[in-house]
Amino acid sequence: VIKLKNIVPYIFIAIIAVGAVLSSMSNYAFDATAEQLKKPTENSIAKRKVDEIFGTDHQLAVIVPSGDYDREAKVISLVEENPSINSALGLANTELDDDHILTEKINARETSKLMNIDYDLCCLLFQAYGAEHDEYNAIFGDVNDYEVPIIDLFMYVHEKMDLGVINLDEDQTNDINDLYDKLTDAKDQLESDNYSRIIFTYKCDIESDEAYQMLKDVRSDVEKYYDECLLVSDSVNSRDLGDSFGGDNNKINLITILALLLILMFTFRSAGVPVLLVLAIQGSVWINFSIPFLTGQRLYFLAYLVVSSIQ
């Protein structure tokens, strides 16, 4: 009995130490739909059924400074070459019709054909547009050498129509108004005063190495044309949570242990009992969360936070 009594503390400390090491080696899932979760959530089950029918498709939003449609088009073209990318949507690749892109630049003669407006009026429009934007090529040079993005031109024409500067017949006015509604909707979705949004889709798993490599490649491609960019997606969220979770969790655990020790010391007015109680409490937490590692399962990080808070 005496020998067993002497051995028990060492066994207790050894178990706690092993639990602490194994729990730190546990693999956490940061996306609720992760396939590796032992007990899927209702959301993940529903999503899995949808994916089985329609296929998996995740979105990646790339935020870049607005105002340069040519650079945006180059970014879209370059990123689409990535094998993990399925599709891209931005103003620079949105079609106006079968022959034109919204951000494509056209001259006065092409505008006359596209909008069915008198050519001389189109020339005046281009000269007025150039003057308002401090671009005088249309005034002092050949007006047909001056080109304007379709989306900007139509916005300008609609603005002048509202001010009564331009008078068109009823059919032309209706066509311009209908097109303006479509352009406004596209700009609201994909462009603000300072930034443009390009939306890509990809099919690799959210927390896979393939997805994380794809994010690195996309950022590298975008930074070839822009000094600043933001990437937003479920994969970005999972990667950022994974990068910060370990360090933050260790800091919180340390602060919790120190705070608990301090409270127990004031309560029991001794050093031995608080240390023993903290070891018992924190040891049980470590032992509990070492089980997923031993069973080879991933633990959803929110479940870990909730359970560890309760314990």
Across the structure, where does each feature detected by a protein language model lie?
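Membrane-embedded transmembrane helical bundles of large multi-pass transporters/channels
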Residues: V1-E35, I206, Q213-Q311
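Solvent-exposed, non-transmembrane loop/terminal regulatory segments of multi-pass membrane proteins
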Residues: M25-D68, N177-T184
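Soluble or luminal CAZymes and related metallo-dependent hydrolases
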Residues: E42, R71, E210
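Extracytoplasmic/secreted envelope proteins and their assembly/folding machinery
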Residues: K47, D51, E72-I76, L215, ...
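A short beta-strand structural signal in non-transmembrane regions
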Residues: D57-S66, F126, D134-D142, T184-S238, ...
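Short acidic amphipathic segments
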Residues: V75-L91, E228
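Conserved hydrophobic/aromatic pocket- or pore-lining residues that grip, position, or stack substrates
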Residues: V79, I198, V278
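Extracytoplasmic
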Residues: N86-R197, D240
